[in-house]
Each structure stands twice: as structure tokens, then as C-alpha cells.
Amino acid sequence: MKFASSAANVTGKKYASCEAATWLNEHFLSSLGDIRKAVDLFFLAGINHVYYHGTCFSPQNEPWPGFLFYAAVELTPANPLWRDFSGLNKYIARVQSFLQQGMSDNDVLLYFPIFDRYADYGRGMLEHFDAISPAFNGTPFRTAADEMIKKGYGFDYISDLQLTNTVPLEGLLQTEGNVYGTLVVPGCKYIPVETFSHILRLANGGVNVIFLGDLPENISGWADVEEKTAFFESLKSGIRFAPTNNPQVMKASYGSGSLLTGSNLEQLFTFAGIPRETMTDHGLAFVRRQNLNGTVYFITNDGDKPFDGWLSLQAGGTSAAIFNPTDDRTGLAKTMVGTGGGTEIYLRLNPDESLLVQIYETGQKGRLYQFYDPVSSPTLVSGTWKVEFMEGGPSLPKPFEAGSPVAWTSQEGEDYDNFSGTARYTGDFTKPPLKADSWLIDLGMVDHSASVTLNGEKVAVLPGPGYSFIIGRKLLKTNNTLLIEVSNLMANRIAWMDRNGLPWKKFYNVNMAARLRENNKNGIFDASDWKPVESGLPGPVKITPLRKAR
């Protein structure tokens, strides 16, 4: 993913766009929550424009599921999840509205050693370079990229041609469209002599260049090999590394700049004065951009534990604001000046939750972004739950009642197992006798998306992966009715069709290939052996009184 965004960032392009989630899971097994988590990874990699994938025209009167082709998430109106697709689209639109402003703000350029791959003998006639293939596993290049992501260093890949178009600028590297603090050349075996010579010119102009591991061993290619090799060796012979006050860093002064080498990348960055974002130590991931207002961060919690505390950011400013792309809540952040002139903000992030943080260079006025603390333990929404099937097929199962929310696939009967569509869960509850500023409604487990109506007012569309939301205290009455419309995957109905030999792979040149070998029968996808995918609202549904955090 960073291949595309790096090219855009280095050359100063406004957009880095991608086809997203096409083969996320096997056909019919991707939820909107799965897509949301995948799209977050695209954003973190520097992508700022998502267009999902193509989908084919299907006549209105075509029997379900209409015309489908190989794009495995099958985002079409025939998919029950289409009802709640707007929730995911609004989230993506809010994030993109920030990430499409300004320019990327990465500190490091990582040289892509393409000639090491060219020199390696492989089994195939063609190797694709649309991602970091397994062939890079264990290489200094892959190790450096993984470590920078883990340690919180923003970086872009750079090619030989892009590097030769880069010039020194007051100790920094100015590419065709951006500025960076240093260049990392990961221990590569081969490099064009023209590239190596230009790297030394950058150092001569004041840039600090990091050679991770050692200098390149040899030149690439066979054209004028003797002449180029002699020139390459003469350049290397003019480099004299000497110890520094850091035993893990060797330095060679070169003109106005320097060449650094060592095996510990973090120590090399520290010596070169390249800062990192320490939020990654807390299981958080980020992408950072500069815009007209200052600096914006897109931050996600990739870990399995909630984050609650002060977060140090490298960007300096006079104020900050928080924007929640999931529910559109906004407000100013509590801030203080951090060490080194950066900003510290108070933040809470649950696992799989994302926030946008805008650091402003000028003071901003407004209300604080509101975090909440629970007043008491959650209360279960118990009692009789009515379940009615609204739309879908192959037929609408009979309605049923249960003492708590349950998956409809837990009911006896093939109609429940085969159904793909939407069911309405209705539960009544009494407001707990507690004072609260707001209330948290948590649906528990949802299979696989939901829209929620409280006392006749639509209050949430929940595509996942999270299924909780906050409501104002005035929305909760003494006696309340909660309607939860749950939509599941296409999988169960498709499996029923395959078991019964009903044709649906009918679109010309459909290319309906299976992603997994066990689903490939006679060279085409087949779901007839699938067991029912759990569907509905296993819950439990809980409500929690909240007070404003001080």
C-alpha cells in the first residue's frame, strides 16, 4: 500500500487512491466491519482516496443475487449489508476530508533496493512489485520498514529515479514534491553507480545519510561494468567512518553533511536527530499530514487494550481539536506543551477506534471534546425480545420471541439457517433510576451490521467493528422501546442455493474463482459444504449511565 502513497508523497501528488477490499475474505464472508478495519490500514499507509472496487450492472428484475463477478466482498444492492453501507461511507468520507488536505509529513526516505531483487534468481518468469513480496522477508529493507512502523517513524519509499531528482535543502532532502529529514539505504548488495554517486552529492550538500548495516557491495548491471566499478570503488575509498560518542554509530563527514552507519536503526535516527511518535509504544498507529491549519493526525488503536491518558505528539501548536469520524462528534482537546516543543493531548481510544487530531498553529475557541466516565455498572436490557424478519430470503422465517437477544441461526429450522436479509429485534426497558449526562448503549455482538431506533427516533447506524454508541440524556424516557434492525451476510443464502443446485453464477465471463482451495469445486467457487454463519443479535444489549469526565 505504501508503494502507491510513497510515489504520491515524494512527487507531491494530492491523491493516493486505491482499490480496496476486493479480495478481503472468501466470497460473501466480508462484513462492513472487516472492510472498515482494512480501510484503516490503507489510511495508515498514506492512502487518502478509497474507491472500493468495480461492480457489474444487474437488471432490476434479475432474481437474487443478480449479476455478480469475482470481487469477493460483493458490495451490491443485493447484499443485505447494503442497508447500513452508509455508515461506513460516512466514516470514510470524514477521514478523507482531512487526509486529502495539505501534504504528507514523513521524516524518512527509505531507498527501495530494486536491483537486489533483479539479481535474485526466482522460480517464475515474472515477479510483481505491487507490494512487498515474501521475497523481501529477512532483508535489511523489510526489517527497516517494519521497525519504523513499529517505532513510530513516518517514512516513504524512494526509487533510484526519484532519488536522482532529489536535491539538498538546508540539511534536508527536497524531492519533487516534499521535504524529508534523512535517507536510509538498507544494507543492499547492488546499486546503480549513478544512484550511489548522487547520494554522496546529497551528503556533500549537507544531508545526513544513513547506511543501515554497511555500504552497498557492488554496482548493478553489466553496461560499462569495468569503468563503473572503478568509479564506484573510488567513491567508496573516499569514505572514512570513525567512532562517535554513541558506540552503535559510525560517522564519516562528507562535505557539509555526513554518512552514518550501524546496525541499530533507532540509535542511528537518534544520532541524526530524527524524532519518532511514541504513541506506537501504546499500541496506537498513525499517519501525519501538514495542512493550512497546522498538522493533522489520523490515529487508530491497533491494540487489544483501551488507551486512556496523555499522548505526546511531535507536532507543535497552540491548540488542538478532536474529530470522531464514526459519530461526527467534535471538540477541542486538553493540551499542554510537551518536551522538545511538541504537543501533549489527553485522549481515549478503545480497540479498533479511530480519531482525527488537528494541531492548530493559532488559538481556537470552543467546547472541549467530551469524554465520559460510567456512573455505575451496565444494566442488561432484559425481558422479552421480539424478532421479526423484514426482508431477504430464500423465505422469511417465522417471527419468534426470546428472553434475551439471540442469533436467529440459534433457532430450530432450516429457514433460519438459510436466511440472508434483515430482522428487527424489539426490546422494551425501563430507564435505570440514576442521574446521567448521557447514556452508552452497547449492543454486544452483532452479526453483522445494525441500525438502531430508540422511541421512534433513529439514533445510530453501526456497520462495525464496534457496536456501541452514546445518546443524550433527553432521548431516554421512563419507558423505552429499542428497535434494532440487524442485517447479515449473503453467505447462508448462497450456500443454500449451491446445495440445491440453483444457478446464480450466470454472468458472462464471471470468473467466480474461490479464494480458498476448500471452496473450489471443478475450478469454480462453491459454498454447498458451508455450515450456517451465525447471524443476528447474540448481544447482550446493555445500557450504562455516563457523566462527563473532568
Segments (PLM) and residue ranges:
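Short, well-ordered loop/turn sites that connect or cap secondary structure elements
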Residues: 349, 452-454, 475-476
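Short, surface-exposed tryptophan/glycine-enriched loops
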Residues: 469-479, 490, 542-546
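Aromatic-lined ligand-binding clefts that engage carbohydrates, nucleic acids, or primary amines
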Residues: 312, 429-455, 462-463, 482-486
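Short, well-structured beta-strand segments enriched in hydrophobic/aromatic residues
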Residues: 354-357, 439, 476-505
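Aromatic-rich membrane-interfacial microdomains
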Residues: 459-469
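Carbohydrate-binding surfaces of carbohydrate-active enzymes
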Residues: 1-422, 430-436, 462, 472, ...
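Glycine/proline-rich low-complexity spacer/linker segments in large multi-domain proteins
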Residues: 363-383, 387, 487-540
